Amino acid sequence: MPKQVDHRERRETIARALWRVVDQRGVQQLTLREVAQEAGISLGQLQHYFASRKAMLTFAMDLAAEQTAERVGQGLRGLGEHPHPREVLRVMLLETLPLHPDARATSRMSAAYVLEALHDEDVRTRARGGLLEGRALVEHLLRQAVADGHLAADRDPAVETGLLLALTGFTTLLELGAVTAEEVVAAVDSHLDRLFGGG
């Protein structure tokens, strides 16, 4: 059992090194050699854990998704036992956007994965599956909100899901300094207020 933990730990260390390469030097520098150097190990050692760039990138993306889910879970626990769906969606949206260092690292990892997905069918299928899963979760929350009377019955959950997910488009604007974090949070809050009848 300890060997498995060590193996997972080493893979996570390599994945975090990959995040740093993406964050500090860009996707174009994302090679096995570059990541090995960043992780402080030899190329051979890295290849013991990841046979290919794609395997390494996929694991790093899975870890980024896990980290985001953990942050969302932590935020949701802070809302108490029966949080309003508006607050649940707010936590989910804000933790997806690069508003703080941890979210920025996972967001940049996601961007690297999307670029890879454009040219690799396997990666595209996997990435698309994750996005569809996220979309289904948001739509389920909205359908439940309608059923519970938190959201007007004339709201179309599928359309509203699309509009909520469109807010993640702030990622590019934030990364390029076209908007501030405060402006993004205000826009998210304004949209949620209108959606749930508070504005």
Segments predicted by a language model, with ranges:
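Helix-loop "lid/cap" segments that line or gate small-molecule binding pockets
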Residues: 94-101, 108-120, 190-195
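Amphipathic alpha-helical packing segments from all-alpha helical-bundle domains
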Residues: 69-70, 102-111, 121-148
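Residues in soluble alpha-helical coiled-coils and helical-bundle/repeat scaffolds
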Residues: 51-55, 80, 101, 105, ...
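C-terminal peripheral helix-coil segments that are non-catalytic and often amphipathic
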Residues: 1, 91-93, 97-98, 135-136, ...
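Helix-turn-helix
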Residues: 13, 17-59
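Generic hydrophobic, amphipathic alpha-helix propensity
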Residues: 7-18, 35, 60-64, 68, ...
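Hydrophobic/aromatic-rich alpha-helical bundle segments in the mid-to-C-terminal region
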Residues: 104, 124-128, 132, 146-195
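Hydrophobic alpha-helical connector segments
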Residues: 59, 70-106, 157-164, 185
